[in-house]
Amino acid sequence: MSSLDFTALLPLILITLASLTLTLIVAGYRQHRLTMVATLIALVLCLAVIPLAAAVSPQHVPPLFIIDRYALFYMGLIFTAALAITLLAYGYMKGLVDQPEEFYVLLLLASLGAAILAASNHFASLFLGLEILSVSLFALLAYPRRFQLSLEAGVKYLILSSASSALLLFGMALIYAETGALGFGQLSTLLSTGALSSEIFFLAGLALIMTGLGFKLSWVPFHLWAADVYQGAPAPVTAFLATVSKGAVFALLLRLFVQVDGPQHHTLIVLLSFIAVATILAGNLLALLQNNIKRILAYSSIAHLGYLLVALLASGNLGVEAVTFYWVAYFIMNLGAFGVVTVLSSPTQEKENLEDYRGLFWHRPGLAGIFTFMLLSLAGIPLTVGFIGKFYIFAAGVEATLWLLLFTFVMGSILGLFYYLRIIIALYQTPTIEKEALASPSSLPLMGSLTLALLTLLLIWWGVYPDPLMRIIQAVAMALI
């Protein structure tokens, strides 16, 4: 491996070394605060070396990885989200009696898997990254093993994820049988030169891969696990599952879609269009029926993945820009929303029912305000980053003339307003006497509160003045296209 390859791979090398080092620290000396601080230092170092890797990008590390601005941008997003989740989770994990330190080891390992996905340029590295991410998530979901819902969430995710991995492997086998190649670049060359004798096996393999990835992204009809798993998982793990896990898989999917020239495969486009419509409508309609905050946000997440699929199908520069910008917005909004749930919850008492948030403004006004901003942004209200993200997707859809998808996109956004406003109204209702008596007078975790405040600031700042972020994202899109 050359020095340039080594420099380009620094973020991946550092996160790997950090995971191993933290494992040894936990094995030798158990101290929750020390483990958390070591995790923060590791993630900050991973972020600090990204500019060094960017200086030598684009760098192909054959045959598995490509380190370009696109991969590094998503790595930065992954590490930043993991950093925020670490800060949000500290107060929550202090309430866990049984060995809270391993949580941070698993968080770093899951982040490693996600970062590998962002840099993958080969089906082998795709599968490696996906399995590291998935196995870490199995353990994280069932981490409070004394609680039945958490164990149930872990087992459900394990069984269904195993099935999706099998479909993924079968799809890879079909593509290899047809093309003799597993690298994304090799596939791109074969397709551009028309070297395929028949596209039947190739399209069947691609469809199976999309099915396997669709489970991870909880597209309809692969979404049935999402609400139960979100509800049963510890609050900080739910935040990770909703953001880092899905963001990394979608980053990989977008690279694969561009490399295989997805818009030229009519059958694939029709299939994904049906999935997008079903995902948007099902996510929003099912969210209307829920009284559990985690389940509402789970179905909201499903709907937002449908919105992102519209931008994916739009393709082109504007489509890639829309996807990337929306992921930044999505990370901020969902980290903030699940962050509020995290700082109010503990391992023994999750604040997840709508009734738990009724009248929150009257005893936690700051937290109610932050939650309100996050929900308004998820709904796409102007002056928030969510509005800019939705406008970007709409513009990409108009440029690609995806009228049916745009109509569904608008209808889904209107439906979403109802369940977001339902939560907001509950936040500001006058609490009952019993509710006031149950309100906890204890102070909120300082690090979690500061993290939420910073997320809210970014949400408003990039909603009002998104130009600097847009310029970065345009450079990222050019690196992929």
UniProtKB/Swiss-Prot annotation:
Transmembrane segments: 6-26, 36-56, 71-91, 100-120, 123-143, 157-177, 200-220, 234-254, 268-288, 296-316, 323-343, 368-388, 401-421, 444-464
Presence of the UniProt keyword Hydrolase in the record: no
Pfam short name (any one): Proton_antipo_M
Broad EC category: translocase
UniProt keywords, alphabetically: Cell inner membrane, Cell membrane, Membrane, NAD, Quinone, Translocase, Transmembrane, Transmembrane helix, Transport, Ubiquinone
Membrane topology: Multi-pass membrane protein
InterPro entries found in the cross-reference section: NADH-Q_OxRdtase_suN/2, ND/Mrp_TM
Protein name: NADH-quinone oxidoreductase subunit N 1
Record note on quaternary structure: NDH-1 is composed of 14 different subunits. Subunits NuoA, H, J, K, L, M, N constitute the membrane sector of the complex.
Cell compartment(s), UniProt: Cell inner membrane
Annotated function: NDH-1 shuttles electrons from NADH, via FMN and iron-sulfur (Fe-S) centers, to quinones in the respiratory chain. The immediate electron acceptor for the enzyme in this species is believed to be ubiquinone. Couples the redox reaction to proton translocation (for every two electrons transferred, four hydrogen ions are translocated across the cytoplasmic membrane), and thus conserves the redox energy in a proton gradient.
Organism for this UniProt entry: Nitrosococcus oceani (strain ATCC 19707 / BCRC 17464 / JCM 30415 / NCIMB 11848 / C-107)
Superkingdom of the organism of origin: Bacteria
Keyword Transport: yes
Encoding gene per record: nuoN1
